Design a protein with these regions (language model features):
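Positively charged n-region of N-terminal signal peptides that target proteins for export
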Residues: 1-4
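Bacterial N-terminal signal peptides
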Residues: 7-16
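Non-catalytic cap/lid and distal C-terminal segments of serine-dependent acyl enzymes
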Residues: 21-278
């Protein structure tokens, strides 16, 4: 791919606390703690530079023969959801409640452009200067990002994608329009109101067999009334109309708000879907 340039640097997210010495309490110079790495790539499809953040849990470094499945996440910037999801993976792998995964966070440039499909709704078009770019974003993931990740890191063919709100909408849309792209789809409070509830209305007809042996969709919803109702309706329609090769989980979480659901829902999803030995 022309125009590719990659710069790998350590992700520095906290400065180590100074340590008191025994001889009078003097302090050492602080040193950075590193957590994963970051690189950028020039996307020809999106005509812009994109930053990618990557976390590999300890088993990856312990053996040069270790290969890991990959969990992709939109909203994957350092100031977005990357760090807290990476922390969940670190803890869950460490305490043996999930299999190790390589986490690949895609940092946003124009979130509402990338994560939404075309819309006929005038209200939808008011949320950002540009919307409806999900097909191009999907091509970027498939044709530019995935090949680079598979070249730079030791990966297995297994893939998953996780997102919340508009990113959850993108996850569900991708399952419907390109189900072979990932093995596991995880969506929290997906914005199914987009384009007059198009994905919900077409849930039965657009969830045909993918050709893979099995796919998984994990849904969770908060106490947000409209979002939880739409997510429940999607789960109900898929249970009725989805093919046999789609494994569906739906977890209502009324104790959470739209602002708080991501972290606890991700913890439950990772533990349930990626148990060791599964």
């Amino acid at each position: 791919m022309r125009g590719l340039w990659v710069t790998a640097v350590a992700l520095v997210f906290v400065v180590a606390s100074a340590l008191a010495q025994r001889d009078g309490g003097s302090q050492t110079q602080p040193v950075p703690l590193t957590f994963g790495e970051t690189f950028t790539l020039q996307s020809e499809i999106l005509s812009e530079v994109r930053r990618i953040n990557v976390y590999a849990p300890p088993p990856y470094a312990q053996s040069p023969d270790t290969r890991l499945p990959v969990l992709y996440m939109p909203d994957g910037g350092m100031a977005e959801d990357f760090l807290h999801i990476a922390g969940l993976i670190q803890v869950s792998v460490g305490n043996g409640t999930m299999r190790p995964f390589l986490l690949v966070g895609i940092e946003n440039t124009e979130r509402r452009r990338d994560l939404t499909g075309p819309t006929q709704s005038a209200d939808d078009k008011k949320i950002a200067p540009r919307v409806g770019g999900s097909a191009a974003f999907r091509r970027f993931i498939r044709s530019e990002l995935m090949p680079i990740v598979n070249t730079r890191y030791r990966t297995t063919p297994e893939t998953a994608i996780m997102g919340e709100s508009l990113a959850g909408l993108f996850v569900v849309e991708t399952l419907f329009v390109e189900p072979d792209l990932f093995d596991t789809y995880i969506a929290f409070d997906p914005s199914l109101w987009w384009n007059n509830k198009e994905l919900l209305e077409k849930a039965g007809s657009r969830s045909g067999a993918s050709g893979k042996q099995q796919r998984t969709l994990y849904l969770a919803s908060s106490d947000e009334k409209d979002l939880s109702l739409l997510t429940q309706q999607l789960a109900d329609r898929l249970r009725k109309n989805a093919p046999a090769d789609l494994r569906l989980h739906y977890e209502p979480m009324p104790q959470e708000t739209h602002a708080t659901i991501y972290h606890p829902a991700a913890l439950q999803a990772l533990r349930r879907l990626f148990k060791p030995g599964r």
